[in-house]
Amino acid sequence: MTLEQKLDRIVLRAEELRAMLAAGVDGERFVAASRELAEIEPVEQQILLLRAAERARDEAEAARADPELRELADAELDSLRETLPRLEHEIRLALLPRDAADERPAILEIRPAAGGDEAALFAAELFAAYRRYADLRGWRFEILDYTETELGGLREGIAEITGRAVFARLKFESGVHRVQRVPATETQGRIHTSTVTVAVLPEAEDVDVEVNEADLRIDVFRASGAGGQHVNKTESAVRITHLPTGIVVAMQEERSQHKNRAKAMKILRARLYEQTRAAAAAGRAADRKSQVGTGDRSERIRTYNFPQGRVTDHRINLTLHKIDRVMLGEFDEIIDALTEEDQAARLAAAGA
């Protein structure tokens, strides 16, 4: 099927759906038709704009035959030579298969990897940077778990981020983030290299993952603070083990055992859902060869070099000399570049 035929079908389908809704249909069919129309109507509008621009181009080319109209027609054609490719590119992007999770909230997990105390300190800074990014985007950032080290570093930080297109924006952040700098405890001025792992998981809905209570082992214990001191005399902390997969989630952020269990289940569902998504993605060779990487947590994706003031994303060879701005939450320039690279790779794979 040619692109033109695909566009014709979309316009025709939108017209059919509008007629169906106007005629009146029963509840379930009405909901399904409304949802489908909402999905394709923005593409239909782009198609109509493209066709209007194509008609304007044809009219301008015909007008060039008139010497009195040639200058005006040439100006119109110059404008349309920019407009037409842009509209066609936007339509091709809109026709790419969508990740069903893109519009979902996300679970952000950050942990220190190699580098001891320095890795934990950078993990805390990176967690704070993503929190500021959420603020800049107008998202809600709720801490589900935040465990500090004695020096104020981060042993484990988990947050739920809700808002528009959260997972779509953050999904390329999963992987190993490397930091190069002179630690505050370094007396010789030597640069140390440490690493932090970031995982971004789409939040799972009940229909995505079925969790059987019989598959869970739930332990309760007393919450502890940094250094292991007890901060709660009641057994409010919860550890849930999913026996079939061995996934373990511990939660002690809340004073209520019930709230800790609810948060732990939310994280467990997200991890199980991501496991399912990863297995499906492994079978899609084109996706796994995407230039922006696989989203694997073991993949080194970015380096933050403080002495040089630079941030380098290794997947797309992008270097920004504005590390201070990035650590203040200004990730958009990096994320935009990653998104464009991913779109280009998917367009190439689709032969578009």
Swiss-Prot record:
GO terms for cellular component: cytoplasm. The modification N5-methylglutamine is found at residue 229. InterPro entries: PCRF, Pep_chain_release_fac_I, Pep_chain_release_fac_I_sf, Prokaryotic/Mito_RF, RF-1. Keywords: Cytoplasm, Methylation, Protein biosynthesis. SUPFAM superfamilies: Release factor (SSF75620). One of its GO terms (molecular function) is translation release factor activity, codon specific. It is found in: Cytoplasm. SMART domains: PCRF (SM00937). The keyword Cytoplasm applies. This is Peptide chain release factor 1.
